[in-house]
Amino acid sequence: MSRIARKQQKNLIQAIAIQRMWRLFELAKSEYAEHPDRSERYVQLIRNISMRNRMSIPREIKNRICKHCYAFLVPGNNARYRLKDGYIVVSCQRCGKEMRYPYKKLK
């Protein structure tokens, strides 16, 4: 197989992996109200896909997963969102850890 064919195959595999991660994320959002354990499993599958293909999880998905206990974070249910000193502070109610994400202030 030539270099170009390998590159095209790798790009195709990564595109499929990203599609699957987004689909699992949507399923986790919809299933959380009735089956929170199922949404935890979907998060685990998202992590497995990203590790298997050696690629990062998209930022929108990554910000909804606890970095310590890998829980699916839902604002108001198991996560608390606060604005503090130019950061969005996300507190996981399951493990008690906090994640901080910077945001730009409007001038």
Swiss-Prot record:
One of its GO terms (cellular component) is cytoplasm. Its EC number is 3.1.26.5. It comes from the Archaea. Keywords: Cytoplasm, Endonuclease, Hydrolase, Metal-binding, Nuclease, tRNA processing, Zinc. Its main location: cytoplasm. Disulfide bonds: none annotated. Part of ribonuclease P, a protein complex that generates mature tRNA molecules by cleaving their 5'-ends. PANTHER family: RIBONUCLEASE P PROTEIN SUBUNIT P21, RIBONUCLEASE P SUBUNIT P21. This is Ribonuclease P protein component 4. It comes from Methanosarcina barkeri (strain Fusaro / DSM 804).
